Regions:
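Beta-barrel outer-membrane channel/assembly domains of diderm bacteria
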Residues: 3-133, 355-359, 371, 387-404, ...
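Residues that define the transmembrane beta-barrel architecture of outer-membrane proteins
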Residues: 49-55, 109-113, 148-152, 194-198, ...
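Surface-exposed coil loops of outer-membrane beta-barrel proteins
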Residues: 89-108, 125-204, 213, 218-220, ...
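Repeated loop/turn-to-beta-strand initiation elements of outer-membrane beta-barrel proteins
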Residues: 68-71, 123-127, 163-167, 175, ...
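Membrane-embedded beta-strands of outer-membrane beta-barrel proteins
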Residues: 59, 115, 154, 166, ...
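Transmembrane beta-strand segments that form the barrel wall of outer-membrane beta-barrel proteins
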Residues: 34-38, 126-141, 166-172, 200, ...
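Outer-membrane beta-barrel translocator/channel fold
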Residues: 82-84, 167-187, 239-335, 413-433
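C-terminal structural cap/anchor segments
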Residues: 297-385, 393-395
Length: 442
C-alpha cells in the first residue's frame, strides 16, 4: 500500500466518525464517467503504426466539509482501463495510450485508486493526497487519452484577498495516463527522477476584464521557472468580444541538471549547453468572437539557447532500466497541439484557428474547429546546419446531447496531420474517436 492510499484509508476512518456533520454528506458529489476511445496514428515515414481501442471508467467522490472553524473532507478517485483491440504489431511499446506487458503487447486491463484529504479555513483550502490534477500555468495535468494523469503531493489555494487567487504546493510523484504505477518527476530525456516540484503564484483579477498572473516553480535538480501572464477581454457588443492572452516563461538550470541521468533533451533540438535547461519563450494569442464564430491568430517565439521545458516523465526508468510508461504531458502554451508542441530552440510559430458553435443555427451541443500551425527557424542540433521547419493541421468536431435519457453523452472526432522538414519526428496522420458520458449519483 503506497503512502497516498494509506493516508486516504486513515482519513476515511477519522472522517467517518463525523459523517453526520452538516456539509460533509449534504455537499457531497459522486459520479461515474465512461470514456471509449479509438486511437489511430499513421507514421508516414515508416515504423510501427498504432491502432488501438480501449474503454475507461472513472469514479469520483467529492465530500463536503465538516462543521467547525476548520472543516475537513475527503475526495476519492478510482479509475480502470480495459484494452479492446489492437494486436502487438499495432501497439508500440512505451506508448502513452495503453500500458505494455513484458513482451511488449498491450496490457488487457489496469486500474488504480487514490484520494485526497482536504481542509478548509475561511477562503483557504488545502489538499493532500495522490489524486491531484493541477491546471496552472506551470503545470497542467494531461487528460488527452483514455485516463487522466494524476499527481501526489499537497496543494493550497487561497482567496482571502478579493479578486486574488493564491496557489502553492509541493508535488512528489506522478501517475501517467497509461500507467497504474507512480514515478518521481523529471523532464524529457531525464532518466533519474526528482521528488520535489514546488510552486507558488497568484492570479489577480485587476478588473472584470483584465487578469494578471505570476508563478514561480522549481523541479529540484532539473529547472527553475518564472511565468508572467496577461489576459484581457474587450467586450465590443453583446455578442462580440476581442480577447488578448499573453504568456512568458523564463527557465534555467537547477542542481544536477546536465549530469548523467538528469539531462534535458531539449525536445530533440539544439541546446547551447547540451543537457541543460536555458530558455525564454513568449506566446501571444488574439481571439475575435462574433456570435458562434471565433477567429484566433497568434505567434510564439522560443529563444535560441534551448528548448522550452516542462514536467515530462516519459524517459524515467525502473530498477531494471525499463521505461516506466509514464509519458504524455501537457504545457501552458498555445502550441500544445494534437501531435506536436513547436517548442524547440529558435522556433518561431505562427498559428490560427477558426471555430463555430452551431447553437446559433438551432443545433445546440454541436461545435467544430480547424487549426493550422507553422514553425520555422528551428536550430539544427549541431547549431551550424540549416534552419528547419514544421507544420500541423488539426480538425475537431464535438457533439453533446442536450436533453433526454442520454443528456450529457458526448462524441468527439479529431484528425491531425503533421509534417516536418529535417525534423527528428516522423510525419504523422492521427485520428481519435472518443465517446464520453458521466452519470452523477449526488
Amino acid at each position: 500500500m503506497n503512502k497516498s492510499t494509506l493516508a486516504v484509508a486513515v482519513a476515511f476512518g477519522v472522517l467517518a466518525q463525523q459523517a453526520g456533520a452538516a456539509g460533509f454528506i449534504e455537499d457531497s458529489k459522486a459520479s461515474l464517467s465512461s470514456r471509449t476511445m479509438y486511437f489511430n496514428n499513421d507514421n508516414r515515414d515508416g515504423g510501427a503504426d498504432q491502432r488501438e481501442a480501449a474503454q475507461g471508467f472513472k469514479f469520483d467522490y467529492l465530500s463536503g466539509f465538516t462543521q467547525g472553524t476548520v472543516g475537513f473532507g475527503l475526495d476519492v478517485q478510482a479509475i480502470s482501463g480495459i484494452h479492446l483491440d489492437g494486436g502487438r504489431g499495432h501497439h508500440p511499446d512505451n506508448n502513452s495510450f495503453n500500458p505494455s506487458d513484458s513482451d511488449g503487447s498491450a496490457t488487457q486491463s489496469w486500474s488504480r485508486i487514490a484520494g485526497n484529504v482536504k481542509a478548509r479555513l475561511s477562503k483557504t483550502e488545502a489538499h493532500l493526497g495522490g489524486a491531484l490534477q493541477p491546471s496552472l500555468p506551470i503545470l497542467v495535468a494531461n487528460d488527452s487519452r483514455l485516463l487522466p494523469q494524476t499527481f501526489e503531493g499537497g496543494t493550497i489555494t487561497s482567496k482571502e484577498i478579493d479578486n486574488v487567487t493564491f496557489n502553492a504546493g509541493q508535488l512528489e510523484h506522478a501517475v501517467g495516463r497509461a500507467s497504474s504505477n507512480s514515478t518521481g518527476l523529471a523532464v524529457a530525456g531525464g532518466t533519474q527522477d526528482s521528488n520535489q516540484f514546488r510552486y507558488a503564484g497568484a492570479d489577480w483579477k485587476v478588473t472584470k476584464d483584465l487578469t494578471l498572473q505570476y508563478y514561480h516553480s522549481n523541479l529540484q535538480d532539473y529547472y527553475k521557472q518564472n511565468f508572467f501572464g496577461l489576459v484581457h477581454v474587450f467586450p465590443i457588443d453583446t455578442n462580440q468580444s476581442f480577447k488578448t492572452d499573453i504568456r512568458y516563461f523564463d527557465s534555467s538550470s537547477d542542481g544536477k541538471n546536465g549530469d548523467a541521468g538528469y539531462r534535458f533533451n531539449n525536445n530533440g533540438g539544439y541546446a547551447k549547453t547540451p543537457g541543460e535547461v536555458d530558455n525564454k519563450t513568449w506566446s501571444a494569442m488574439f481571439t475575435y468572437t462574433l456570435g458562434g464564430n471565433a477567429f484566433l491568430l497568434g505567434h510564439q517565439r522560443v529563444n535560441d539557447d534551448g528548448g522550452f521545458v516542462y514536467l515530462n516523465q516519459g524517459n524515467v526508468v525502473d530498477g531494471n532500466g525499463r521505461p516506466e510508461g509514464a509519458g504524455g504531458a501537457s504545457f501552458y502554451l498555445f502550441t500544445d497541439s494534437m501531435i506536436n508542441g513547436f517548442v524547440r530552440a529558435g522556433e518561431n510559430t505562427t498559428f490560427g484557428q477558426y471555430s463555430y458553435d452551431f447553437a446559433g443555427l438551432g443545433v445546440p451541443g454541436l461545435k467544430a474547429s480547424i487549426a493550422y500551425l507553422h514553425g520555422d527557424n528551428i536550430k539544427a542540433t549541431n547549431g551550424t546546419g540549416s534552419d528547419m521547419s514544421e507544420w500541423e493541421r488539426d480538425m475537431r468536431i464535438d457533439y453533446t446531447v442536450q436533453q433526454g435519457t442520454l443528456k450529457g453523452f458526448g462524441v468527439t472526432l479529431r484528425n491531425g496531420v503533421y509534417r516536418g522538414s529535417q525534423i527528428n519526428i516522423a510525419d504523422q496522420d492521427q485520428t481519435r474517436l472518443i465517446f464520453n458520458y458521466t452519470y452523477s449519483f449526488l
